[in-house]
Amino acid sequence: MQPSNDPAIVDMAAAEKEKKRPSVSFLKLFSFADFYDCVLMALGSIGACIHGASVPVFFIFFGKLINIIGLAYLFPQEASHKVAKYSLDFVYLSVVILFSSWLEVACWMHTGERQAAKIRKAYLRSMLSQDISLFDTEISTGEVISAITSEILVVQDAISEKVGNFMHFISRFIAGFAIGFASVWQISLVTLSIVPFIALAGGIYAFVSSGLIVRVRKSYVKANEIAEEVIGNVRTVQAFTGEEKAVSSYQGALRNTYNYGRKAGLAKGLGLGSLHFVLFLSWALLIWFTSIVVHKGIANGGESFTTMLNVVIAGLSLGQAAPDISTFMRASAAAYPIFQMIERNTEDKTGRKLGNVNGDILFKDVTFTYPSRPDVVIFDKLNFVIPAGKVVALVGGSGSGKSTMISLIERFYEPTDGAVMLDGNDIRYLDLKWLRGHIGLVNQEPVLFATTIRENIMYGKDDATSEEITNAAKLSEAISFINNLPEGFETQVGERGIQLSGGQKQRISISRAIVKNPSILLLDEATSALDAESEKIVQEALDRVMVGRTTVVVAHRLSTVRNADIIAVVGGGKIIESGSHDELISNPDGAYSSLLRIQEAASPNLNHTPSLPVSTKPLPELPITETTSSIHQSVNQPDTTKQAKVTVGRLYSMIRPDWKYGLCGTLGSFIAGSQMPLFALGIAQALVSYYMDWETTQNEVKRISILFCCGSVITVIVHTIEHTTFGIMGERLTLRVRQKMFSAILRNEIGWFDKVDNTSSMLASRLESDATLLRTIVVDRSTILLENLGLVVTAFIISFILNWRLTLVVLATYPLIISGHISEKIFMQGYGGNLSKAYLKANMLAGESISNIRTVVAFCAEEKVLDLYSKELLEPSERSFRRGQMAGILYGVSQFFIFSSYGLALWYGSILMEKGLSSFESVMKTFMVLIVTALVMGEVLALAPDLLKGNQMVVSVFELLDRRTQVVGDTGEELSNVEGTIELKGVHFSYPSRPDVTIFSDFNLLVPSGKSMALVGQSGSGKSSVLSLVLRFYDPTAGIIMIDGQDIKKLKLKSLRRHIGLVQQEPALFATTIYENILYGKEGASESEVMEAAKLANAHSFISSLPEGYSTKVGERGIQMSGGQRQRIAIARAVLKNPEILLLDEATSALDVESERVVQQALDRLMRDRTTVVVAHRLSTIKNSDMISVIQDGKIIEQGSHNILVENKNGPYSKLISLQQRQRHHP
């Protein structure tokens, strides 16, 4: 929806949007708490309340001590005993604080982790139960990854120790005021009048910053979507040298984030500055008022002073609770889309379960349009009967609606009118899981999950036995290649099955459907990816499987469906004609006969080919995949140049370009920090003046109040400078690091993306989390460090000047205070890295299941996915309990030492006064300054291990940035005046992920300039590996590959790829318009060039028929287009590039016969005077090639033109032809 251009309307709309920013109530975040969580929260709350209330109790003792010490010059001996007694009370109080703070942290951390895990599972469960149409129109994989990576972490942060922290401060606030009113109500009342101003300043800051943070997060979602899509289609991006364009898009998406982040920095500076401004003015008022209370004898100096301290610190607790409130608000906003999804009403999927399934399917007056394109009518009053136990074939043009009929039977979509019936029952009223449980589906583009072959087959039947799995693999002819794998069924297939060839993926996909033993079988080009020999065997296996089952086959190759009981020609939203093969060909003017004639004309010499063959994605053509062991042994081996350490200097070098901002921020931080000890000195001076004569008290109070008023103005300025400059620096760092990481990812060779740890979901997740972590360490923590450094330096200078003896004693307790903090931090840090890795695996699983949602729901695998997801969350959940216990104990110990040290300091101060070595004034001033210092000293030094060990937390950032690609391409010569002669000379090659498996050994191939070379052979023989080597997706282990006599390793990589066009078997489109997808072939091409390319690829007519034409969005991974439409867009993209060398990997495989004929003609024109390498299973498409090479086991076993090769009747090529001809006549 585009915003209005009217500024007034825009402002009103923005204000309204800000006002109505959606969020959920805070209590709703705890919706998933069970009884055990409630017990944990109750115990944690009790601990937090006792911990918070202990501080005001401390001030009661403190007030009595002050009074004793203040009057010690009258009765020194007696005073010393009393001080010792109260100092011991401090120790008892410290023990209470130890246990209560442990309970607070341990319980809240554990319950937070437990509840967040349940929210994660509920979110994914809801996602998996949504209607498929939602994924066409509203939800992207990037959105899901962002929600699970970031948003739920924000919620987890808000429902764990942050709640304990908040209750701690609130109980301190309540207890402080209660004790204050009981002690000196007059002072408490004046203080109470100030608290609303403090709370208001904190509240406004929290509200503004939370609004900006929501906007920042929304911007990140868009950037995440771009990253996930680009990395997922990295082969296409690299083949079309689109890396810079991708980085530019990503940077554009991040620019909004940067703008909002800068505003958040300014808001934080003004917010915290205003908070301190109010505090300074409040203290000036209170010091003056307390002096009057003491003068009039309402209360003594110690009591009055500690009441004032107590009430102000209680008020301050509201300020300290403000960041927690901000976290709660942020979580409420972040949780809105999550809970909205969890509670989203899906249509009731329960229903009747039939006792027996015959398999009669009826389309009754079915009208249908896709939700994403409601203007385009696919079916209008469609009526069709699929009898039980029969094989029904659907044929017709690409985009005619064949696959849509399968989607309607699977109930991926509901008809807009009419009904789909099963055995006389409207399938809308049948239980959805039960329905899908009786249907087996094999798609044209097989979808596998990044797990083992065994697990992939078990998606068909979760409790399948080893025997059932093996039998299914035998039936699909997958067993032969699986047995050749080092790890057999336990072999990892990689993201989207990338480690396997297309034929191997399809066979596993068929095994998955077979193991299900369904009543209804839906085959959408099920044998399309197989070579002729495998196809024959698999087709026979499928024929056996089809017996007695209702089977619906979608096919472009008519030869595959000759024996179907019924063949239906789909077109124009209706069934044009139907009948058996013999019945249909008896009508020479019929649609089927017309299609048959077109196909026969395409391959007269071969009498047809039966398959819609597909070879593979352009790389892992071979039969061996990456195994878990080989990943660690080999794939990671080149990356062993990991930096063992990332120095602090290296961390800070990242912000060198922004040193001016850093300098201003450092100055602001140092001044802001140094204000606190000076403030404490002013308060201590006021306290001392309460024990002097009235005139002296008045003068001192007046002087201190004026200084505080000046300080209030300075604090606003320095806080604004500090947070604005560091905010800008932090956002610039994040922007720079994300951009560098993204560029570094795209710089890597294709082999790097084959690794299990480098899937698109995991890398997109890392881009989001790692850059933010680096910013937190380098900028956010440095801000606190510098501020507290200013505080500590100023405090020690003042303390040593005032009373060096007392300072040294207090300083001696600091190691104990700090050790607790440091231990806690180191302990937490040790868990941090491992936990983030555990979540990465879970995030990858979630992203993968959403991107393959159709396969998941078709196989009723939602529960399987959720079980796997739960297992991935088990480790962080188990660790959270131990982590919470240790963190709680260490936190409690550090609190114990802090309060015990106060008792020691006051006791020692009284001894010094007793011996006449110190005055009351110097003791109180030193003590007050050191109290403030001790409160933050632990925090400062606890940051040190984070900064020093920051390399462990962000090492992955630098690993990525420092990694040298194994295919170096930024040096070398430019390739110009390309003639196009390709030569592979003595090539030895094995994939980096499986170095033990040799693909080529002394492989030689020459493709003369301007000639076409076809590569044929069985699936997994190495055909697509040739294309991958020419494109330099991989480098050979030995031998050279030359273009026009130049070693391609000595050429600039982008220069090489600019002259090569690629069309893959599974076309990779981007989630943008058709126009933008075609334009990807040639940046800056004119509109007429784009349209001409579309016409050549036979895409213009179907594009023009769409309501939005070339502006039609193709959806994530081109899901809104049919397979044939996607392929034609991909061909148009290659046509537009107009390359000297053309690589076609089953370029016409997804097209119907009519489209294929026209596109083949277009490709023939395109191939003229151009060096072309064609990979094909279907021999009819390559009979006109200048040369044909038959590849088997990584070697060329026969080579020549079609006419020469067919003369050798016993040759491999002739055998392939006769096999396909036999299939044509006896399918």
Swiss-Prot record:
One of its GO terms (cellular component) is mitochondrion. ATP 1 binds at G396, G397, S398, G399, S400, G401, K402, S403. The keyword Lipid biosynthesis does not apply. One of its GO terms (molecular function) is ABC-type transporter activity. Expressed in the sieve elements. It is a multi-pass membrane protein. Residues 41-330, 662-949 form the ABC transmembrane type-1 domain. Induction: Regulated by the transcription factors NAC045 and NAC086. Glycans are attached at N758, N834. The chain crosses the membrane at residues 38-62, 90-110, 169-188, 194-214, 269-289, 297-317, 663-683, 704-724, 784-804, 806-826, 889-909, 927-947. It is found in: Membrane. SUPFAM superfamilies: ABC transporter transmembrane region, P-loop containing nucleoside triphosphate hydrolases. Keywords: ATP-binding, Glycoprotein, Membrane, Nucleotide-binding, Repeat, Transmembrane, Transmembrane helix, Transport. The keyword Ion transport does not apply. Residues 361-597, 982-1218 form the ABC transporter domain. ATP 2 binds at G1017, Q1018, S1019, G1020, S1021, G1022, K1023, S1024. Belongs to the ABC transporter superfamily. ABCB family. Multidrug resistance exporter (TC 3.A.1.201) subfamily. Interacts with 1-naphthylphthalamic acid (NPA). This is ABC transporter B family member 10. It comes from Arabidopsis thaliana (Mouse-ear cress).
